[in-house]
């Protein structure tokens, strides 16, 4: 065990959560700045139409991957924490073996499907044969995306420092690459290549670091013991949990990808680029929401299992801090968004101001809901959380189609804000009606 793990275990639960979150947010803060600069340089170099085309290429690959992503990271944490706390390396090793197998199979399947479907999906989004070739080439990076188990291993052993560094890799590559591409007035294929290399590299780094951690803590303890026969059925409830987190992950990600491609289909690549730009800027809040879930889930699971009152403290205080931070960004966008977009990106992107404000509001609501969702998972109510997000996603997609058709891009932002409030309200009611002594675990 390293010094990082020793020192974190000595902290009270809330301080440990904040310490781990700070480790990640330092990396994410630098990454967010570089990602924004890279996006801004690409937008300035290519213009709205070709910028939107790169966005559609990336979104297509992410959409296909999301369809086959079983989000094994949460399974490793949910079922790995008890084994880790009891130093049961055999059970932990078998769990990781099962989850790794799922990662490998799903990433290979996603790559094959993306390559097969690309010639048909590309033209429907306004792509010519050249763009379709770029779309197929970009799809190959999906082979590197089976990283759920790797992320779970690093979270299990409190290596949030590694996760923090990993988050800076893709933005750094894109930042450096975009500077050179902007300086040389590069073509669209150069930017597609930069984005693909960055995306693959960050995944390969995580796989490498998790392998080192696995070899140190688990493989050595399993010397002479075979785990090749590990099966999904060895873990009670794991199959159900994976299906729940699969659908939950899709409910989080797929609507965003679907709506981006729908805007490209209905309004054109330029408008799809503006929507993606607003999402990229609102990721200043949506990405911390993901980080909070990564950091907080381990401690919430442990405190719920132990029946500690720290469970409520961690969940509610983190939600309040997230809400206060998010509102600052919403107000900044409302009052200064037009000036900032015009200065940083150019006047042709000022039209994204209104949708940006709504997307930041939706991201703020998601930021508040993020620790509550981890609490729901820790309590054993993952299926109930998923049902809330099914309702939210249904509302979002219906409102998106209706409001975008009538109001344009601003309708997409309004739909996102209304839908984001649904799971927040539902999870608050669910948590308030349950106490640690009623744990389902």
Describe these PLM feature segments.
Residues 15-77, 111, 115, 243-270, ...:
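Signature of the first transmembrane helix
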Residues 19-35, 57, 66-119, 128, ...:
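Membrane-water interface segments that mark the loop-to-transmembrane alpha-helix transition
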Residues 131-136, 164-221, 392-395, 409-433:
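Hydrophobic alpha-helical transmembrane segments
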């Amino acid at each position: 065990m390293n010094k990082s793990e020793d020192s974190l275990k000595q902290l009270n639960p809330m301080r440990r959560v904040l310490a781990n979150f700070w480790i990640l947010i330092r990396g994410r803060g630098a990454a967010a700045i570089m990602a924004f600069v890279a996006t801004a340089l690409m937008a300035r170099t290519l213009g709205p139409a070709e910028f939107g085309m790169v966005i559609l290429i990336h979104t297509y690959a992410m959409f296909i991957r999301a369809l086959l992503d079983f989000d094994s990271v949460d399974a490793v944490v949910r079922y790995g924490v008890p084994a880790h706390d009891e130093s049961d390396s055999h059970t932990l090793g078998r769990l990781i073996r099962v989850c790794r197998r799922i990662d490998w199979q799903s990433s290979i399947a996603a790559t094959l499907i993306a390559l097969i479907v690309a010639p048909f999906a590309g033209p429907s989004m306004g792509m010519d044969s050249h763009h379709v070739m770029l779309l197929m080439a970009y799809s190959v990076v999906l082979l590197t995306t089976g990283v759920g188990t790797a992320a779970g291993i690093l979270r299990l052993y409190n290596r949030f420092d590694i996760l923090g560094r990993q988050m800076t890799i893709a933005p750094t590559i894109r930042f450096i690459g975009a500077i050179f591409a902007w300086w040389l007035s590069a073509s669209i294929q150069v930017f597609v290549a930069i984005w693909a290399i960055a995306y693959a590299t960050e995944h390969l780094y995580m796989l490498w670091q998790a392998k080192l951690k696995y070899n140190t803590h688990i493989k050595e303890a399993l010397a002479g013991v075979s785990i090749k026969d590990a099966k999904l059925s060895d873990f009670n409830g794991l199959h159900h949990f994976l299906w729940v987190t699969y659908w939950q992950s899709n409910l989080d990600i797929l609507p965003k990808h679907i709506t981006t491609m729908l805007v490209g289909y209905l309004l054109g690549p330029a408008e799809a680029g503006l929507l993606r730009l607003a999402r990229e800027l609102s990721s200043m809040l949506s990405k911390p929401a993901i980080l909070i879930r990564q950091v907080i889930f381990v401690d919430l699971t442990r405190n719920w299992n132990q029946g500690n009152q720290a469970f409520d403290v961690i969940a509610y205080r983190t939600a309040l801090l997230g809400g206060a931070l998010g509102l600052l960004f919403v107000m900044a966008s409302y009052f200064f968004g037009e000036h900032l977009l015009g200065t940083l990106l150019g006047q042709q992107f000022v039209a994204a101001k209104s949708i940006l404000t709504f997307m930041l509001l939706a991201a703020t609501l998601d930021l508040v809901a993020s620790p509550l969702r981890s609490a729901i998972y820790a309590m054993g109510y993952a299926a109930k959380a998923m049902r809330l997000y099914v309702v939210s996603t249904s509302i979002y997609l219906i409102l998106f189609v209706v409001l975008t058709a009538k109001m344009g891009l601003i309708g997409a932002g309004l739909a996102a804000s209304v839908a984001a409030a649904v799971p927040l309200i539902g999870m608050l009611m669910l948590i308030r009606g349950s106490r640690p002594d009623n744990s389902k675990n």
